[in-house]
Amino acid sequence: MAVARHGCPPWGSILGLLVLALAAAAAWDVSFLRCSLGSFCECDFWPDLPGLECDLARHLAGQHLAKALVVKSLKAFVQDPAPSKPLVLSLHGWTGTGKSYVSSLLAQYLFRGGLRSPHVHHFSPIIHFPHPSHTEQYKNELKSWVQGNLTACGRSLFLFDEMDKLPPGLMEVLKPFLGPSWVVYGTNYRKAIFIFISNTGGEQINQVALEAWRSRRDREEISLQEVEPAVSQAVLDNPHHGFWRSGIMEEQLLDAVVPFLPLQRHHVRHCVLNELAQLGLEPREEVVQAVLDSTTYFPEEEQLFSSNGCKTVASRITFFL
């Protein structure tokens, strides 16, 4: 899904295009002045938080907790000229609920080069750490990579996907970089951002959402306090999670546990409409309904939540066009 920086104006209107042009010009002037007077935009770091907030509001369906936590955490961190530690967020939830999408938006709206920026680093266990027997080698390589890149630029973003599939103990080498005590040669590493993504805790989050629905509570009434303890405990109990028996959890180096709720049918519909718009296609109702009807839902009795969230929406649309 493409990202429009600076303004996120209404689509398809002359007024929207005018707003985009004016917003871009104003943002350029302000950003140029801001970068000229300080180190705010060092290393390709060019944050557009209003654009991020707008994009999340428009395109991230059913995730009031994730939206609020991500935006609040980033605003406080980016606006602090001397943060005491790096920003560390751990994203949890069922498959297809928006975790990877949010992480890609962070790269797009924080760095001019987006995911292609040399200061955005994405790690996948399947690609980078495929053999558990090589864990010690991976530890040395990961520590060297993180330290080397932080030495080059303290304003770096590190994304760790599929934390459920990492070799045990690997993440422990990151602990010195996540707190306030580590010194990296010549740069302020405390300006770095670390994002960890996993499905662990998804079942616990789903259960909270299901109980809220059964109690006829509004979904937006679900609070972080209802889900965070269960998610944290699920991480501690999962020997396959990268934070299992980790000092990162014990020393409370995570700034926020960000829960992603399971998606209902109307949320999947929102994803279908977004994808059709992205493809430049009219929202044909027969295509929308075909995608929704072909999606599987759970629990078996209520048929309430999408089994794959919005993950398979794009491929299903292609099939039904």
From Swiss-Prot:
Where in the sequence is the signal peptide annotated?
Answer: 1-27
**Sugar-bearing residues?**
149
What family is reported?
Belongs to the ClpA/ClpB family. Torsin subfamily.
Assembly and partners are described as: Homohexamer. Interacts with TOR1AIP1.
Q: Output the GO biological process annotations, alphabetical, semicolon-separated.
A: chaperone cofactor-dependent protein refolding; positive regulation of calcium ion transmembrane transport; positive regulation of gene expression
Amino-acid positions noted as binding ATP in the UniProt annotation, renumbered to this chain:
93-100
* Localization per Swiss-Prot or TrEMBL: Endoplasmic reticulum lumen
Provide this UniProt record's keywords sorted from A to Z: ATP-binding, Endoplasmic reticulum, Glycoprotein, Nucleotide-binding, Signal
What is the protein's major site of localization? endoplasmic reticulum
GO CC term (a single one): endoplasmic reticulum lumen
Organism listed in the record: Rattus norvegicus
Q: Which PANTHER family match?
A: TORSIN, TORSIN-2A
- InterPro entries given in the database record: ClpA/B, P-loop_NTPase, TOR1A_C, Torsin, Torsin_1/2
Q: What is this protein called?
A: Torsin-2A
Which molecular-function annotations from GO does this UniProt entry contain? ATP binding; ATP hydrolysis activity; identical protein binding
Source organism superkingdom: Eukaryota
